[in-house]
């Protein structure tokens, strides 16, 4: 289940799938991939996931 705060910035080409929680004022930048298909992923408030990162 995705739980993404409404203040999260999702850049073009980013992908968020599966069991993912993303906190307030977080940036998910260009072509970053966050996959929570094998377990829960938690990204806290005011975090920054840079271009092309894979989590």
Segments and roles (model prediction):
Residues 2, 6-10, 14, 20, ...:
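A structural motif detector for beta-strand N-caps
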């Amino acid at each position: 289940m995705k739980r993404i705060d409404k203040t999260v910035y999702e850049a073009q080409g980013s992908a968020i799938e599966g069991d993912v929680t993303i906190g307030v004022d977080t940036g998910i930048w260009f072509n970053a991939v966050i996959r929570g298909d094998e377990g829960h992923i938690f990204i806290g408030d005011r975090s920054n996931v840079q271009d092309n990162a894979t989590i």
